[in-house]
Amino acid sequence: MLRILFGSLLLSGAMAVSTAAQNAPGVTDREIKIGQTMPYTGPGGWVSSLGQAEKAYMQMINDQGGINGRKINLISADDGYLLWRTGMETRKLIEVDHVAFTFGSLGTTTQLAVARYLNERKIPQLFIESGAYRWGNYKETPYTIGGVRPSYRLGARLYARYILRQDQNAKICILYEDSDFGRDYAAGVRDVLGDKYAATVKEATYEFTDPSVDRQIVELEASGCTALIAAMLPPLAVQTIRKVSDLGWKPLFFMNNVSASVPVVLEPVGVENCIGLLSYAYAKDPLDPTFEDDPGMKDWRAWMSKYLPGEDVRRPSFVNGYNSAATMVQVLKQAGDDLSRENIMRQATNLRDLELPMLLPGIKINTSPTDYYPVQQLQLVRFDGKRWVRFGDLVYDE
């Protein structure tokens, strides 16, 4: 009898160890350790507010007691927006810090550089702060899912359709960074134009390290384009808007959403030079008076005041980081006490009609094992000299 009882205890103990072992590294009864890389310095430092926001949101969750009694320890490492540092810091997060997974790391090129490393080890690479279309390739990178934002390619489709509604014979110019980020814009326009692309579109590209795009802008203006789509990061976006203004060129002008920040891009170039500029939105804008009494906006402002006092509430990265972190928290809530990497990935790809307080009304987050695009709705906006004004209907991916 004692032998049977002892055997049962051994079996019970083995099962307990086995169950506990299912949880990912970095998960204890009191903590969930998460990692990310973020450019707090270097050429991508302008967007470090994303990391600030995500850390601040997790601090709020911890102050509220955490998730199922576990506090979130978000280790946010500075990669300087440099490929070699992204690789080094990611390896450190996994092999030294032993995080459960990565979340909210920034950059298309930088995250592509570590995607294979993470996927081979079946480590979730969640909600990358990038709208690259490739993050939806669930077959090639099943442990990678894109950001809480529309894909760049979807944004380009929206621009192209709007241009054609204004002028069926429009001549379209696209100025873009020669990377996955920029090429997604050309691909989106091609999706709309099909075999008419070559006859309708004039392309100009540049490298991330190029100090200027003035030459490309002059060439595009001389080609007779009536519409210009610019896909670039903020430093060159400032240059582009200024050069277009200096030339007296008046195309139907679209700036990618990444570079639509009023304080980061439009004010440095002079808001008077940006009137009529077009872009798209998917998140609530703190400058939009229609959200003044919105409960979600009020909660967000209270959070900013408490956790990020003195920061510029006009910077969209604080809203985007808030949305991304809220989505990550929902995944962890759905995961319950099964915090294995497999289940975390399963929950990240099973979000159903998730509404966030700082997404535009009507926009919901949906993912599935065969749909890795969390946000597939967006709306056109036009700059009026003070703020971005929404117009038209909410557009769904087609």
Residue map of PLM features:
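A local structural motif
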Residues: I67-D78, D97-A100, Y197-T205, G224-A227, ...
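Extracellular/periplasmic periplasmic-binding protein-like sensory domains
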Residues: R149, V244-N320, L394-D397
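Segments of small-molecule ligand-sensing domains
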Residues: K306, G310-V319, V329-W388
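Hydrophobic alpha-helical segments within soluble ligand-binding/sensing domains
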Residues: T86, G147-K171, P211-D214, A237, ...
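Extracytoplasmic ligand/sensor domains, especially the bilobed periplasmic-binding protein
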Residues: V99-A204, F253-S279
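Beta-alpha junction/loop-to-helix N-cap segments that form part of ligand/metal-binding clefts
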Residues: N23, E31, W46-Q52, D63-N137, ...
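Extracytoplasmic "Venus flytrap"
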Residues: A24-E31, G35-K55, A77-W84, L106-G107, ...
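Short, low-complexity disordered leader/linker segments with a strong preference
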Residues: M1-K33, D397-E398
